[in-house]
Amino acid sequence: MTSSERMAKVVLVDIEGTTTSISFVHDILFPYAKQNVEKFLRNSWEEDDIQHIVQDLQQVPQFADYKALLSAPPAEVDFELIAGFVRYLIDQDLKVTPMKTLQGLIWAQGYTNGELKGHVYEDVPTAFKAWRAAGLQIAVYSSGSVAAQKLIFGHSLVGNLQPYLSAYFDTHVGHKQEQQSYETIAKLLKEDPKHILFLTDIPGEAAAARSAGLQAIILQRPGNAALADDQKASFELIPDFKPLQNLKLPLNKYQA
């Protein structure tokens, strides 16, 4: 099935490498969080929601590994220790849920004060408009927290894109290369998996989605990782959203 022949009721989009450049995430968002995490924790250390995140971070298996790397770990957990651990997680590109939540709070300040604007490719808002006009829903599934997802689309370079989006999912529903995560999303959307089209740049995610019954297409945006020949043969590949701008709803309940 080619992109021009596809039909769906929901388009489920990844962010990094799909709607948004990988360089924005790695060269702007991650460094911003690293640079500001210590100041943020210092100023908000006593707040209940921050302390909940701190407690969750201490339960992460890598926390013990990080402390073992320190020449003189502090006797008590303080904001400097947690800030260092968060920087360690970012450097290791470990997608830990409480760290992602904390990043989202830090980025929120950056978006609010105008230091950050969410990058989206130029074909994204055009596709969003076309899909919604055709009656499709658009949902987001990213390893970044739901709060961070809303910030990128709510404070994008082209304005607020949130009105086009009907649902957001992060690692609270499961990891992105696990079949069950996509089964959970389909249930939460109350939609037949075959009527959900997942767009991503990661073959492992596309495979997990397809094993759950979803349709899946891989984006080959500039800067995305190169694909092996078997991966290219296994999935439909598109360079951007333009081939999908005429995506239509299924004609009836029997058509995928």
Curated annotation (Swiss-Prot):
It catalyses: 5-methylsulfanyl-2,3-dioxopentyl phosphate + H2O = 1,2-dihydroxy-5-(methylsulfanyl)pent-1-en-3-one + phosphate. Binds 1 Mg(2+) ion per subunit. SUPFAM superfamilies: HAD-like. One of its GO terms (molecular function) is acireductone synthase activity. Keywords: Amino-acid biosynthesis, Cytoplasm, Hydrolase, Magnesium, Metal-binding, Methionine biosynthesis, Nucleus. Pathway: Amino-acid biosynthesis; L-methionine biosynthesis via salvage pathway; L-methionine from S-methyl-5-thio-alpha-D-ribose 1-phosphate: step 3/6; Amino-acid biosynthesis; L-methionine biosynthesis via salvage pathway; L-methionine from S-methyl-5-thio-alpha-D-ribose 1-phosphate: step 4/6. The keyword Ribosomal protein does not apply. The keyword Phosphoprotein does not apply. Gene3D superfamilies: 1.10.720.60, HAD superfamily/HAD-like. CDD domains: HAD_EP. Substrate binds at S142, S143, K176. Mg(2+) binds at D14, E16, D201. It is an enzyme of class 3 (hydrolase). InterPro entries: Enolase-ppase_E1, ENOPH1_eukaryotes, HAD-like_sf, HAD-SF_hydro_IA, HAD_sf. Bifunctional enzyme that catalyzes the enolization of 2,3-diketo-5-methylthiopentyl-1-phosphate (DK-MTP-1-P) into the intermediate 2-hydroxy-3-keto-5-methylthiopentenyl-1-phosphate (HK-MTPenyl-1-P), which is then dephosphorylated to form the acireductone 1,2-dihydroxy-3-keto-5-methylthiopentene (DHK-MTPene). Belongs to the HAD-like hydrolase superfamily. MasA/MtnC family. NCBIfam families: enolase-ppase. Monomer. This is Enolase-phosphatase E1.
